[in-house]
């Protein structure tokens, strides 16, 4: 069983709500294969580092999200101070961090060090959970800005590497740097140096977000998306009148990077599964069906963010003035680490999971990990998984 937690900045708090309900309803359930992309890497790393059953782990995850504030993610200052610091270095000797990205994220590193690390920078507890057999692999997805490749960093037992022209994997001992890199929203947060290269958000070029879990041997994948599935009527509704504001354009770009790929990959997996069902085993070329369940918000998280737009301060207030207003400020929903918004998303996630209890229970039935020999046959290299 694999768990995929996709990106979306502050939207990832929605996943914490879903997981909290799963922990309460299925406390003995475990996900041996964890994959995190973008802010989903924080949630995946939390599950991979903390001991206890699913209920205990998810309760601590929710507590961590409820504690977070904008000042725990990026340097919080007035919009005027931010503009001055971004445009002009205060001294010749000052590091040029603020020119590498709009926001400086050293507070997030400090926060993650307190929550996930043993003080050395390594993710505490992962080795113990691997040794106990509770965990098979933890994977964190990043983008190598130097090569343009999607790089998946994996800590696990006897994991075979994969390599394609545009996506590769490396076996390693995961650290806070890997989590920071995966969550580094392009242009907004600075890239993170790992070795000789700089890495950013794992969703930038990730055309097949389900692929890492499949490579790692998952025969079932539960994916928690942060994208609301609009109805046709909602999709046809104009978001603004006149020329599109910068916020609308930027939001669409962010959605295309972090939210749209999972839907396309899920559709491709469904088609491949249907095709394999029609073929005898000897003609499947080593491929096998992979069961998939995607859970997603019942409401538009961007529209929820609009309720808080008038209350933001610091850099977000300046961004709001520059970007203009829209009915669904998706860009804001990714940066709005305010307690009220985070709490609301956790509540929505919990309620959504509870209302889909029967569907989830049916999917989780008989969720046993396949033998390793079979897991190696699970590489799904058809269309959509060979980018």
List each language-model region with its residue ranges.
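Catalytic nucleophile serine of serine hydrolases
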Residues: 38
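Residues forming the Rossmann-fold NAD(P)(H) cofactor-binding site
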Residues: 41
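Patatin-like phospholipase
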Residues: 1-35, 45-387
């Amino acid at each position: 069983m694999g768990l995929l937690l996709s990106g979306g900045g502050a939207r990832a708090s929605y996943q914490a709500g879903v997981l909290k309900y799963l922990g309460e309803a299925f406390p003995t359930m475990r996900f041996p294969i964890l994959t995190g992309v973008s802010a989903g890497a924080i949630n995946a790393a939390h599950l991979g580092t903390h001991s206890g059953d699913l209920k205990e782990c998810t309760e601590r995850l929710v507590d961590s999200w409820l504690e977070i504030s904008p000042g725990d993610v990026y340097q919080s200052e007035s919009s005027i101070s931010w503009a001055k610091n971004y445009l002009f270095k205060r001294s010749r000797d000052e590091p040029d961090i603020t020119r590498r990205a709009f926001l400086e994220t050293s507070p997030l590193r400090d926060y993650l060090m307190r929550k996930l690390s043993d003080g050395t920078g390594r993710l505490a507890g992962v080795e113990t959970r691997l040794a106990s057999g509770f965990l098979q692999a933890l994977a964190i997805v990043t983008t190598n800005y130097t090569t343009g490749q999607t790089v998946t960093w994996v800590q696990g037992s006897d994991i075979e590497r994969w390599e394609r022209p545009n996506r590769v994997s490396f076996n390693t001992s995961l650290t806070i740097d890997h989590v920071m890199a995966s969550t580094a929203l392009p242009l907004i947060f600075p890239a993170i140096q790992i070795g000789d290269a700089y890495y950013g958000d794992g969703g930038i070029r990730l055309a097949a977000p389900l692929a890492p879990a499949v490579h790692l041997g998952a025969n079932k994948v539960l994916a928690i998306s942060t994208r609301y599935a609009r109805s046709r009527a909602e999709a046809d509704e104009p978001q603004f009148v006149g020329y599109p504001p910068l916020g609308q354009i930027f939001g669409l770009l962010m959605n295309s990077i972090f939210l749209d790929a999972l839907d396309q990959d899920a559709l491709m997996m469904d088609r491949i599964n249907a095709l394999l069902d029609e073929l005898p085993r000897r003609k499947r070329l080593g491929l096998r069906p992979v069961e998939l369940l995607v859970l997603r918000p019942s409401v538009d998280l961007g529209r929820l963010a609009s309720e808080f737009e008038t209350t933001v301060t610091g850099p977000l207030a300046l961004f709001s003035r520059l970007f203009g207003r829209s009915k669904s400020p998706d860009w804001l929903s990714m940066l709005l680490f305010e307690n009220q918004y985070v709490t609301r998303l956790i509540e929505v996630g919990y309620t959504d999971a509870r209302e889909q209890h029967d569907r989830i229970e049916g999917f989780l039935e008989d969720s046993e990990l396949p033998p390793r020999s079979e897991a190696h046959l699970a590489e799904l290299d058809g269309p959509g998984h060979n980018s």
